């Protein structure tokens, strides 16, 4: 049964000694039988054993060449043949003793399996000296070979447990036979039991030493080995080994080996090997059946021997794997391919993943994870740490990154029932960088930072208990809750204090304080926002109410002739109230506007000289022919502005009859005002100034004085400030006023004043509404006139749409060379149109603003309208005053500017309105104003007559007025 040479080579490797091989030659047939039977018993592949037997036979046939062949074929062993070698060697060499020895070694090696390292050195020490010089030499070679081949070559190809066992069995049998023959004289039968035993232990270590043995043992069924180990260990005692040991001095090495084995937990195996050796010698002498019976015993002994060998080999392999993983040498791992990598643990209970992670070998960790499976990532060592936890403890960020982001270890970011989360470990071990990365990752994944462990400790608690301030700061930066209490009722600051970490405790106290303050700030800010929103809504509601009241005032059926009509007065006073409410907010704007009116009355004169020049040129053109009328209209405008606002609001609702009555009234008033335009303008300015004084008393009073004393331009400024439309400077405000006044205009002013306004309208554009306030007829004609100013004064007066267009464009276009009287007449005609155009009032307002530059005549009409429509003025003064307040801002000096800027932006209008409201608030009642206006008209008729000419001059020459 000759096996291939590679098998022979394997066999040769096992039979290190030539003499041993020779002995095996003699016993080859029996050995072959035994090997076959043993192979069957051992569940080792019979084919392998048969091959081994044949090769063994051939090898013994080459007694002298065996050593050479062995040495020659070591490289071959290094190649795959080792797998087959164990089988051939066992079968070829002494069948009986081989089998016995093989089994014996199986038992020993299986026990030794965990101690392969120990076995190898032991083999080197005591292996062959007992056998003889040749065997010892062979053993030396084997030792060398065992160290190199077993650790390096055999491991990759042969499973240490299976192959090593059969190999050791074969070698042990061969060596036992060889030793028996050598020592006892080729015949194992003659050898005493002791000698056999001694030789056997020697051989056993030798067999253990041979790498081929270990692979054979590996090949041998591990179960049988284990059984043999158990039985032999139990049955065989150390004394048997002792017998084996002392039997031979040559075996002193073997004794040493045995002693080593004894010292090792595999001493039992060695002991087993000793009695096995005895049995083996007997069996060698006895029949194959006896040998077979010995096989189980020998096998057990062998198993012990193999157990020791296998253990040593296994331990060697494990240690080598652990070393490789420790060093992160991934390239060496495939050569150590083991079926049970996941069962390899070090003394601390760390599996390979623990080791790789703790050492920071990310690539090795990934490779091992692919080999072992991710389930191993959940294993915990003696410290109850997973590979991820151990990596955190050792600060291996890359490994933590990979495990958390790519494997199931992400589950460890959350606390489990029994174990804390990874950030707990990071805080516990003070790993700030890892903690930072974990927090970032958790933030991205939406994982809570405040999870607690079994004791209710959050990561902040753990970090504070261990005094890692940096970790605490990192956690705080990422929003960890520092006020949480654990199950003991401690906050992190208290835990830090209790553990003596005062710095951390202080920091946490500061953070708690800041957090509480911040929360309060947030609450206050939220409340402030809510209140601000409410305030804004209230303001908007107030504005809506004011607008509604204004529109109601415009649409109020109460005629301006009935100034005391409760609806109009109520609406006015409501507007005033709302204005007052808003004035709280807009007081600043109103006061500023009034102050501006005061200062602007002077400064605007200088500033608006250019504008006034332009507007004055227009006024000159418009007023040049009818300056007296213009003066009257200005006066009327100043009075009518308020009246027109009130009346314009009510005029829409006012029946046509009332409007006609008002128109007739206004015509009379206009006639009066024409005669008394100067005095009316002064008077109207004065009474209006008085309310203006109420609005802004300090400035209005000097303004009033200046109005009376100053040129009609100054009086117009005062008028404007006093809600008089006389001054074109009011026009930006007056436009608004005039718009509302246009709405009210139907009754207030006479046509004459309106034409004046219209004539002024081109320049003032805003006065027409003021005139309408005096008389609806006038206001409408004024607005229409202003509109005409844009297009043609007559056509504008005739068509409300043209009025609207002109009112917008008339500011600069207002150049009515036509007599103002005609304008006023057209205004009377257009009063009805203005009533229609009251909705168009905003457009007219620009015209009225322009007209306001003219309002000298309008002031007359205003005075008249005040006398006739004082009630209306009272009702509508709030609006008119709002507008007039803006008008005073635009004093005569501003008339030109306003004439240019008659299309005052609604914002400025709003401001003007606010100012007017404030002035209205301060104004006692329009009745008082009207009385003042009447008084002024009476007392100042002469002055105004004088000033009419003066106003006419100013209207013709606005600069001189300033």
Curated annotation (Swiss-Prot):
Residues 80-99, 104-137, 222-249, 548-590, 667-852 are annotated as: Disordered. Ubiquitinated; mediated by SIAH1 or RNF19A and leading to its subsequent proteasomal degradation. Pfam families: Ank_2, SNCAIP_SNCA_bd. It comes from the Eukaryota. This is Synphilin-1. It comes from Mus musculus. The keyword Coiled coil applies. ANK repeats lie at residues 348-379, 383-412, 418-447, 455-484, 602-631, 698-728. SUPFAM superfamilies: Ankyrin repeat. One of its GO terms (cellular component) is cytoplasm. The keyword S-adenosyl-L-methionine does not apply.
């Amino acid at each position: 049964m000759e096996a291939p040479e590679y098998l022979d080579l394997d066999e040769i490797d096992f039979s290190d000694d030539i003499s041993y091989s020779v002995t095996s030659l003699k016993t080859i047939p029996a050995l072959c039988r035994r090997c076959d039977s043993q192979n069957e018993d051992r569940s080792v592949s019979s084919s392998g054993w048969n091959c081994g037997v044949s090769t063994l036979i051939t090898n013994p046939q080459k007694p002298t060449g065996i050593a050479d062949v062995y040495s020659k074929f070591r490289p071959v062993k290094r190649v795959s043949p080792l797998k087959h070698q164990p089988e051939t060697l066992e079968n070829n060499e002494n069948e009986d003793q081989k089998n016995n020895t093989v089994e014996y070694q199986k038992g020993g090696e299986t026990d030794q399996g965990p101690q392969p390292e120990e076995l190898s050195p032991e083999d080197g020490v005591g292996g062959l000296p007992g056998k003889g010089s040749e065997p010892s030499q062979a053993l030396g070679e084997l030792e060398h070979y065992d160290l190199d081949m077993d650790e390096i070559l055999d491991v990759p190809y042969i499973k240490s447990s299976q192959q090593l066992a059969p190999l050791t069995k074969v070698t042990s049998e061969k060596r036992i036979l060889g030793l028996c023959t050598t020592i006892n004289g080729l015949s194992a039968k003659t050898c005493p039991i002791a000698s056999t035993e001694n030789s056997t232990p020697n051989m056993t270590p030798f067999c253990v030493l041979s790498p081929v043995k270990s692979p054979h043992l590996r090949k041998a069924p591990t179960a049988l080995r284990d059984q043999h180990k158990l039985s032999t260990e139990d049955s065989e005692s150390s004394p048997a080994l002792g017998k084996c040991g002392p039997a031979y001095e040559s075996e002193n090495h073997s004794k040493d080996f045995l002693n080593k084995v004894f010292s090792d937990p595999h001493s039992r195996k060695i002991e087993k090997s000793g009695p096995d050796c005895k049995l083996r010698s007997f069996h060698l002498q006895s029949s194959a059946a006896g040998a077979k019976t010995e096989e189980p015993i020998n096998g057990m002994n062998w198993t012990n021997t193999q157990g020791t060998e296998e253990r040593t080999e296994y331990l060697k392999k494990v240690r080598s794997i652990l070393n490789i993983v420790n060093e992160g040498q991934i390239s060496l791992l495939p050569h150590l391919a083991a079926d049970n990598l996941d069962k390899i643990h070090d003394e601390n209970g760390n599996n390979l993943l623990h080791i790789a992670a703790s050492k920071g070998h990310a690539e090795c960790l990934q490779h091992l994870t692919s080999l072992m499976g991710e389930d191993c990532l959940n294993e915990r060592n003696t410290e109850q740490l997973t590979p991820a936890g151990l990596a955190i403890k050792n600060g291996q960020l890359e490994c933590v990154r990979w495990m958390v982001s790519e494997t199931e270890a992400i589950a460890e970011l959350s606390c489990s029932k029994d174990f804390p989360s990874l950030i707990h470990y990071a805080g516990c071990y003070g790993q700030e960088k890892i903690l930072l990365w974990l927090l970032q990752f958790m933030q991205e994944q939406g994982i809570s930072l405040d999870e607690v462990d079994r004791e209710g400790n959050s990561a902040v608690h753990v970090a504070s208990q261990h005094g890692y301030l940096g970790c605490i700061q990192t956690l705080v930066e990422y929003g960890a809750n520092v006020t949480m209490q654990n199950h003991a009722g401690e906050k992190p600051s208290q835990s830090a204090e209790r553990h003596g970490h005062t710095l951390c405790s202080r920091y946490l106290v500061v953070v708690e304080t800041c957090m509480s303050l911040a929360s309060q700030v947030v609450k206050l800010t939220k409340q402030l926002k809510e209140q601000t929103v409410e305030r804004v809504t209230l303001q908007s509601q107030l504005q809506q109410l004011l607008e509604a009241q204004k529109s109601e005032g415009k649409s109020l059926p109460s005629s301006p002739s009935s100034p005391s009509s409760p609806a109009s007065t109520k609406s006015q006073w409501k507007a005033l109230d709302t204005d007052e409410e808003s004035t709280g907010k807009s007081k600043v704007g109103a006061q500023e506007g009034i102050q501006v009116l005061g200062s602007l009355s002077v400064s605007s004169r200088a500033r608006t000289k250019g504008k006034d020049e332009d507007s004055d040129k227009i006024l000159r053109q418009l007023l040049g022919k009818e300056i007296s009328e213009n003066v009257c209209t200005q006066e009327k405008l100043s009075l009518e502005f308020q009246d027109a606002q009130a009346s314009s609001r009510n005029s829409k609702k006012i029946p046509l009859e009332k409007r006609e009555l008002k128109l007739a009234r206004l015509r009379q008033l206009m006639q009066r005002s024409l005669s008394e335009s100067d005095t009316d303008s002064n008077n109207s300015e004065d009474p209006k100034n008085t309310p203006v004084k109420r609005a802004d008393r300090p400035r209005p009073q000097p303004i009033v004085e200046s109005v009376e004393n100053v040129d009609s331009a100054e009086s117009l400024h005062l008028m404007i400030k006093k809600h008089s439309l006389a001054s074109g400077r009011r026009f930006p405000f007056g436009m608004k006023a005039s718009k509302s006044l246009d709405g009210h205009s139907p009754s207030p002013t006479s046509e004459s004043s309106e034409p004046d306004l219209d004539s002024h309208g081109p320049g003032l554009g805003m006065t027409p509404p003021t005139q309408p306030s005096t008389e609806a007829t006038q206001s409408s004609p004024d607005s229409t006139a202003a509109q005409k100013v844009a297009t043609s004064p007559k056509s504008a007066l005739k068509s409300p749409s043209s009025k609207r267009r002109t009112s917008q464009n008339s500011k600069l276009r207002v150049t009515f060379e036509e007599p103002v009287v005609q304008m006023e007449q057209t205004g009377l005609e257009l009063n009805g149109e203005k009533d229609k155009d009251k909705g168009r009032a905003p457009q007219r307002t620009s015209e009225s603003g322009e007209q306001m530059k003219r309002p000298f005549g309008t002031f007359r009409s205003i005075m008249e309208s005040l006398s006739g429509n004082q009630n209306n003025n009272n009702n509508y003064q709030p609006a008119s005053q709002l507008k007039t307040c803006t008008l005073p801002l635009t004093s005569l000096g501003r008339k030109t500017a306003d004439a240019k800027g008659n299309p005052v932006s609604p914002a400025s209008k709003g401001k003007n309105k606010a100012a007017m409201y404030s002035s209205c608030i301060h104004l006692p009642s329009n009745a008082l104003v009207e009385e003042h206006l009447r008084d002024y008209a009476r007392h100042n008729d002469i002055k105004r007559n004088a000033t009419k000419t003066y106003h006419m001059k100013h209207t013709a020459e606005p600069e001189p007025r300033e």
